[in-house]
Swiss-Prot record:
Taxonomic superkingdom: Bacteria
Keywords linked to the UniProt accession: Cytoplasm, Hydrolase, RNA-binding, tRNA-binding
Pfam families the record matches: Pept_tRNA_hydro
Function: Hydrolyzes ribosome-free peptidyl-tRNAs (with 1 or more amino acids incorporated), which drop off the ribosome during protein synthesis, or as a result of ribosome stalling. Catalyzes the release of premature peptidyl moieties from peptidyl-tRNA molecules trapped in stalled 50S ribosomal subunits, and thus maintains levels of free tRNAs and 50S ribosomes.
Coiled-coil blocks: none
Native species: Laribacter hongkongensis (strain HLHK9)
Gene: pth
Protein name, UniProt field: Peptidyl-tRNA hydrolase
Residues annotated to bind tRNA: Y17, Y64, N66, N112
Length: 189
């Protein structure tokens, strides 16, 4: 059972994107870093914001979503972090707002941030926390949808799911994903 040593909060940089659905991963990671008393700072060698609490590292890529792998791979190489010790937190179109699910490995499901991380790490075998943002219903609307803020009621549901996911952090950091999954997948129904 590997422990998690790196939490990655996916999103796009800049204030114009901070409140958009695509930044749900960054919202979770902001709160997780605060809980661990880790303060982010810009770190150019990691192409993003970086924070550390003991052996736990956090990164928020500032490369835009499509190039997130550059940041993740830089931290992983520098600190010799294995893919199975990485938790990537991201928005998930295939889950409704209020849902959150852990998953290890698998495809990128069209998510460009995950696609780039797969490529940069050379494997899809890292942990993910998928935060449901819902789907616009029409595939042609996805790009527009993820770059807009959620409606108020959706934001409330996403915030609740993030809270439930944060409650699993002690299990996650120990690498006890069966316990974390049981807690989260039960709470987020």
């Amino acid at each position: 059972m590997s422990t998690i040593r790196l939490i990655v909060g996916l999103g796009n940089p800049g204030p114009e994107y901070a409140a958009t659905r695509h930044n749900a991963g960054a919202w979770f990671t902001d709160q997780a870093a605060r809980r661990e008393h880790a303060t982010p700072r810009l770190e150019s060698k990691f192409f993003g914001l970086y924070a550390r609490s003991g052996e736990l590292h956090f990164v928020w890529p500032q490369t835009y979503m499509n190039a997130s792998g550059k940041s993740v791979a830089a931290v992983a190489r520098f600190y010799k972090i294995l893919p199975e010790e990485i938790l990537v937190v991201h928005d998930e179109l295939d889950l409704p707002p209020g849902s959150a699910r852990f998953k290890k490995g698998g495809g990128h499901g069209g998510h460009n941030g995950l696609r780039d991380i797969h490529s940069a790490l050379g494997t899809p075998d890292y942990w993910r926390l998928r935060l449901g943002i819902g789907h616009p219903g029409d595939k042609s609307q996805v790009a527009h949808f993820v770059l807009k803020p959620p409606r108020s009621e959706e934001q409330t549901l996403i915030d609740i799911a993030i809270g439930h996911a944060l409650d699993t952090l002690p299990d996650v950091l120990r690498g006890d994903f069966p316990a974390a999954m049981k807690t989260l997948h039960t709470a987020a129904k």
